[in-house]
UniProtKB/Swiss-Prot annotation:
Disulfide bonds: none annotated. Its main location: plastid. F-type ATPases have 2 components, CF(1) - the catalytic core - and CF(0) - the membrane proton channel. CF(1) has five subunits: alpha(3), beta(3), gamma(1), delta(1), epsilon(1). CF(0) has three main subunits: a, b and c. InterPro entries: ATP_synth_F1_dsu/esu, ATP_synth_F1_dsu/esu_N, ATP_synth_F1_esu_C, ATPsynth_dsu/esu_N. The lineage of its organism: Eukaryota, Viridiplantae, Streptophyta, Embryophyta, Tracheophyta. Produces ATP from ADP in the presence of a proton gradient across the membrane. SUPFAM superfamilies: Epsilon subunit of F1F0-ATP synthase N-terminal domain (SSF51344). This is ATP synthase epsilon chain, chloroplastic. One of its GO terms (cellular component) is chloroplast thylakoid membrane. It is found in: Plastid, Chloroplast thylakoid membrane. Keywords: ATP synthesis, CF(1), Chloroplast, Hydrogen ion transport, Ion transport, Membrane, Plastid, Thylakoid, Transport. HAMAP family: ATP_synth_epsil_bac.
Amino acid sequence: MNLNLRVLTPNRVVWDSPVNEIILSTNSGKIGILPNHASLVTAVDIAVMQIRINSQWSTIVLMGGFAKIDNNELLLLVYDAEKGVDIDPQEAQETFNKAKTNLNKAEGKRQKIEADLAVKKARTRLEAINVLTPTSISN
């Protein structure tokens, strides 16, 4: 038995096909989702979602949003999403480095919050392609 996963952004459908297992980061922690999971509505964090199809794992970077699980259907409505295989490692590393530089230069509360968010998004993209592990990245 499978789960039907749909990942939607305001502009496109990122994923719409059956999967065997999902590891999803919510605002209250990571959850594993298998077929026949209890119904649930939750906020989704900026994080990497892991997807298993048979024995193969894939990743999708989620930039926050909401998830609804019901009757083996998982619907994710997210602000933005990107498949891990579509991320250019060199560009992702450059974006992360630039975001960290901007965070160090940030002045004022608003600039620091925006810069910190940019670092989190860039770090998440790197994690999706395994360039860096979560424990090897520091702010």
